[in-house]
Amino acid sequence: MAILKLIEIFSSWRKGRVLRKRLKPLDFGEISWKSTTGSTNQDLLLKAQSGTNQLSVAIADHQTAGKGREKRQWISEKRSSLLMSVRFEVDLVSDPISLYSMKLSVSVVRALEMLGFSEIKIKWPNDLVTIHDGELHKLAGILAQSTIKGSHASVVVGLGLNISLVNLRTLLPDDHISALSEIGQPPDVIDLAEGILREICVFDLKNDSLLAEYEKYSHTLGTHVRVEVDEEIFEGLAKRVTQTGSLVVKLDNGSEREISVGEIIHLR
């Protein structure tokens, strides 16, 4: 067992070394790749307190305490997912935190498209989905967490992307989930991480290019949705996404509601 553990640690270290070398010309901070960690998001939030550089990256082959939206547990199996977090240093006066999770979701879809996966869409706010027989199947989840001091924030955005399912459907029998292995030949995990991180460097949040790309890949816009916010439920047409990432829904009476948090169900 000790030898197998050492092999896992060395394999992860090697992947991190290769990735750091490939991304050296770009403006990334520390890039770490572990065999196992509690949570890549928490790793970077802790490092933020010590003042580590902008665009630090944490990747793991396995997480033991991963979290999804609404404090749900994020379940993954060893070496079956890309588990990656990126830290941004943010001026809250000019850049809403929500735009950084949008930035990561668009970067992932664009990177996957370049690797041959062209049918992946974004379900608001930032789930990546595939569509089988008219039903949405979750391929990846994105979670943003932050520490705020005055008008400055350290924002950590984490990604859990299913590469293969192994036994995940047995563990989550009631969930509609998917993996890259079900829709094509899974890419090398280093190539995948590199592609996503390169895409992150493309977008300047001070122009409309990010929003335009988000709308291009959105599966939610133009569909009828049921929205659940706190204890309120309403239905309408998903019309557009605002500059801060909120979803605008047109109700049957012609009025519009803007939501920044909540669960949506696609009706048709």
Predicted feature residues:
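N-terminal lobe of the biotin/lipoate ligase/transferase fold
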Residues: 1-114, 134-138
